[in-house]
UniProtKB/Swiss-Prot annotation:
This is Elongation factor 1-beta. It comes from Methanococcus maripaludis (strain C5 / ATCC BAA-1333). The keyword Protein biosynthesis applies. NCBIfam families: aEF-1_beta, PRK00435.1. Gene3D superfamilies: 3.30.70.60. GO terms for molecular function: translation elongation factor activity. Belongs to the EF-1-beta/EF-1-delta family.
Amino acid sequence: MATVIAKVKVMPTSPEVEKEALKETLKELVENNDAKCRGVSDEPLAFGLYTVFVMVEMEEKEGGMDPIEEAMNALENVESAEVVELSLV
């Protein structure tokens, strides 16, 4: 099977969400879903808001990134999470 690399864009619920804690939570979530976290970064957006990007590496399988994306969206401090890039390696 092929390896999939995905870039997930995560928007926190507010600027008050602790950035480093959110990044650590996302990294743990990825690793608990049979995937590797290849990196977590953040970019300022506006008015104190920021976007977190998570690079995920996993084996190609049925359902793909859906379980990880759904788990990220279910987190308390996450407004939205969506896969913005996907490629096979």
